[in-house]
Amino acid sequence: MTIEDLPDIPLEGSSLIGRYPFLFTGSDTSVIFSISAAPMPSDCEFSFFDPNDASCQEILFDPKTSVSELFAILRQWVPQVQQNIDIIGNEILKRGCNVNDRDGLTDMTLLHYTCKSGAHGIGDVETAVKFAAQLIDLGADASLRSRWTNMNALHYASYFDVPELIRVLLKTSKPKDVDATCSDFNFGTALHIAAHNLCAGAVKTLLELGANPAFRNDKGQIPADVVPDPVDMPLEMADAAAIAKEIKQMLLDSMPLPCTITKATLPNCDITTSKAMLTTLGLKLGDRVVIAGQKVGTLRFCGTTEFASGQWAGIELDEPEGKNNGSVGRVQYFKCAPKYGIFAPLSKITKVKDGRKNITHTPSTKATLHARSQKVDVAHVTSKVNSGLMTSKKENASESTLSLPRSEELKTVAKNDATQPGCISSSSSTSSLDHKQSHPKKLSTSSSSGKKTLSKSPSLPSRASAGLKSSTTSAANNTHREGALRLGERVLVVGQRVGTIKFFGTTNFAPGYWYGIELEKPHGKNDGSVGGVQYFSCSPRYGIFAPPSRVQRLSDSLDTLSEISSNKQNHSYPGFRRSFSTTSASSQKEINRRNAFAK
């Protein structure tokens, strides 16, 4: 039923209640009010309705202002409106609107709007909680859904991260359905919605009030599965990555323990199935495998799991690029060091071929190995410049190291040089370990013996409080492979921001390796710290973190271009966010080539 279905009923004035009280008070059928524009004063200097303004107050309290117009005011997502949800809502009720009537444009009730108005930074939580309690006392139905979004009041409160409203809704609503699903979120629950939107407060409150962390949506995902991966987050969301990690751990810790007694008493057919599948693939536990042609590790587990259906392989990686220590949701499938464990479907793994067990099959590795296989004897040649060639002993050591992938190379170097002063263990960042490889610019010739020696960097302090070891030495004291970025080097971040590398290594806020860059202008997000962990020091808003794929060495042409990009960034249109897509990155490189050619 819509308001248009009512015969010649004026929406303005108090006469509506007197003439047609049966349509509103105590009515079981909710009314959907027609769509209207928000009324604005003729001399208004701003584009939104401000209930604190005198001219706006005249309109708000005018009995001739219709319910449809008041709903239109509620749709304005500005603090001036959302923080006065109770004043505007009471005016709607005064005009005879039923507590469960709906806005014709959004199909939302007053309770839906109230749950939105509790959003931090826009509305006022205390006001929203009081008005929500008032609406529920008047008979507001918390189970009603918007027919546009299929969301009920609990879904809205979870989406906008208002734990105080979640408590009110679940305390007063009957029946208490904390796991009600929503079709717009793959039939996930409020816990799925909160987890997907990184609403830590809502996740914690829902778990406390009995939400099921093992509930699976239509895609078979539990709430922990829908938490965004920090690696996929934009550059500006380094702080959100720490929240994502916290939420996922919170959800995994709350997973129910598996019933191992029942499994122990039943014949385990899964073991037979797993062995048969491994035999078909020509694999066995302990074999070296490659995951999706990228990550290399050792097969430690094969079988069914609690976190997903089907057969899964558990792999202990060579590098800390995994997700766990062999356990998921308090179920230990195999044991390994933290971040060295990962699970993958059997279709994603292949056995490493003999003779290439330690090689990750990447194009760069193949090209490097091909180049190294072509050796020329230049021992009899006397070079006028330092060619970077080492003694036969060093050369043999280098060859054995270079035949390994990056992960094994770091481990071998750390093991061989553990007793040497100034060396760094394998737990240090990749940047600090790159000095183990030979580099022509870092070799010096002794005048007395004519032998070439490799300069070593001094020993480095560790950050025990941060739980990681990062290199703080200057770029001049580190030796890298050719083309690698060094600490202290000026770089360009995502083709726009210019800064200096101050940190490189693993972090607590996201897996993988990250560059910490001190920008030349205050366009950053932090002071070198994220989530209370200090990775490097700089002025506030001068620090930013970026993955290696988004950082490039600053050349002369890039330096000029970065100034142009920086100026454009300062004059970007409001309401639009830059998209750092692959297309824009390739266009950036094209511009660089054109500038270089013009010179």
Swiss-Prot record:
Task: Write one Pfam family the protein is assigned to.
Answer: CAP_GLY
What top-level branch of life does the organism fall under? Eukaryota
Is the keyword Protease assigned to this protein?
A: no
Q: Where is this region: Disordered?
A: 387-482, 565-599
What's in the keyword line of the UniProt record?
Answer: ANK repeat, Phosphoprotein, Repeat
Bias regions of kind Low complexity — which residues?
443-462, 576-587
Specify whether Lipoprotein is a keyword of the entry: no
| Biased composition annotated in UniProt, kind: Polar residues | 468-478
Residue span(s) of domain CAP-Gly: 303-345, 505-547
Sorted alphabetically, which InterPro entries does this protein's record hold?
Ankyrin_rpt, Ankyrin_rpt-contain_sf, CAP-Gly_dom_sf, CAP-Gly_domain
Where do the ANK repeats start and stop?
A: 65-101, 149-180, 186-215
Q: Which residues carry this modification: Phosphoserine?
A: 557
State the PANTHER family in the record: CAP-GLY DOMAIN-CONTAINING LINKER PROTEIN 4, DYNACTIN 1-RELATED MICROTUBULE-BINDING
Q: Identify this protein by name.
A: CAP-Gly domain-containing linker protein 4
Organism listed in the record? Rattus norvegicus
